Amino acid sequence: MNKQRGTFSEVSLAQDPKRQQRKPKGNKSSISATEQEIFQVELNLQNASLNHQGIDKIYDCQGLLPPPEKLTAKMLGIICIVLMSAVLKTIVLIPFLEQNNSSPNTRTQKARPCGHCPEEWITYSNSCYYIGKERRTWEESLQACASKNSSSLLSIDNEEEMKFLASILPSSWIGVFCNSSHHPWVTINGLAFKHEIKDSDHAERNCAMLHVCGLISDQCGSSRIIRRGFIMLTRLVLNS
């Protein structure tokens, strides 16, 4: 009986080391599982970090234009600025160029004060004109012109001059007359007057006047009804 107990004890003791050897195996599996879990967590964190960085890069890239598109946008901006500058220059320069390119005849057709003419006179085609708007007879107008040096009552030279002066003073005496209805029309300088004068058949209408309808005749002593002025002329050689 003691032998059996001893054997059993030995067997039991012999079996105990096996059990003791199994326990380390259980510890190793627990450690390895823990390490795997830690590794998996670290891996997940790394992946999450990489994914976050990738998303940030994507958003950053979305806020920027690719180089070709950026270059195109810059070129379009430069073109717009150049075109706007050209339009502004055109708007500013066209009136200036038109004024400078206007012909001398066009410039002289405009009534304007001239430094070479007396004050309150106007210039047209190298001549100075004084527009007298007072109501006077033909004789009074002739005397008013004679009182000014180198001036005379106007005698029309051409159609352009006649239209120009009629636009300024629609009714005015001119330096043209006739002695009777049977005599020719002459200027105050004694030269034959070549332009047609309407209503010249009346015996008492021996003085000519400029009207919007052209040249007409009237009584030399008349200053009635229509406000008749007069035009004095002084011819000068004006510098351009």
From Swiss-Prot:
Q: Which residues form the C-type lectin domain?
A: 116-230
GO MF entry, a single one: transmembrane signaling receptor activity
Q: What does the record say about its membrane topology? A: Single-pass type II membrane protein
In which tissues has expression of this protein been reported?
A: Natural killer cells.
Question: InterPro entries, from UniProt?
Answer: C-type_lectin-like, C-type_lectin-like/link_sf, CTDL_fold, NKG2/CD94_NK_receptors, NKR-like_CTLD
TM ranges are 71-93
> Mind telling me which GO cellular component terms the entry cites?
external side of plasma membrane
Keywords tagged on the record: Disulfide bond, Glycoprotein, Lectin, Membrane, Receptor, Signal-anchor, Transmembrane, Transmembrane helix
Cytoplasmic membrane side: 1-70
Region called Disordered, residue ranges: 1-31
Where it mainly occurs, coarsely classed, is membrane
Which ranges of this chain reside in the Extracellular compartment per its record?
A: 94-240
Job description of the protein: Plays a role as a receptor for the recognition of MHC class I HLA-E molecules by NK cells and some cytotoxic T-cells.
Task: Return the protein name.
Answer: NKG2-E type II integral membrane protein
* Species this protein is from: Pan troglodytes
